[in-house]
Amino acid sequence: MKMVFGALFLLSGMILSAQTEKKPEMLTKETFREKVWDYEKNPREFIYKGDKPCLIDFYADWCGPCRKIAPYMEEFMTTYAGEIYVYKINTDQQKELAQMFQARSIPMVLLVPMKGQPQKTVGAYPKEQYQQMIETTLLGRPAVAQ
């Protein structure tokens, strides 16, 4: 009987932890237009639709450097919870978005501040460098000497 209760307790804990694990939201053309920029309505001007700055990771499943930075993006969901949105765009599945932002080399990270134009970085950087970009570009905080 103790074994049954122990197993049920363990199973419920695993289910609960899986439900609270946060991953960046995957964007499609449609959700990108809803949450980031409706480029069909405003094709000449980037008008950000979000209520917080965002970071968008353009990636592909087969890309080694993309897999390397994926845990950073997941960590930023927690570190900057309530301050920024973290999104992902699969360049193999969302070719129109990849072409629009000229994501020819990946990983490519697009930093979208509340005001101004998005800034992009290409390549895999150390986590601390992404944190510095988030702090200065997205949150407007002073650069921290490392």
Predicted regions and their residues:
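C-type cytochrome heme c attachment motif
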Residues: 61-68, 108
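Non-catalytic, surface beta->alpha helical segment in thiol-disulfide oxidoreductase systems
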Residues: 105, 110-146
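Structural micro-motif
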Residues: 53, 95, 101-110
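Extracytoplasmic/secreted proteins, especially bacterial periplasmic and envelope-associated proteins
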Residues: 31, 54-57, 68, 72, ...
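A short beta-strand-turn-helix
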Residues: 28-53
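N-terminal targeting signals for export/organelle localization
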Residues: 1-33, 141-146
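Thiol-based oxidoreductase modules, predominantly thioredoxin-like and allied folds used
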Residues: 58, 69, 73-77, 81-96, ...
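Short pre-active-site segment immediately N-terminal to redox-active cysteine/selenocysteine motifs
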Residues: 51-54, 58-62, 105
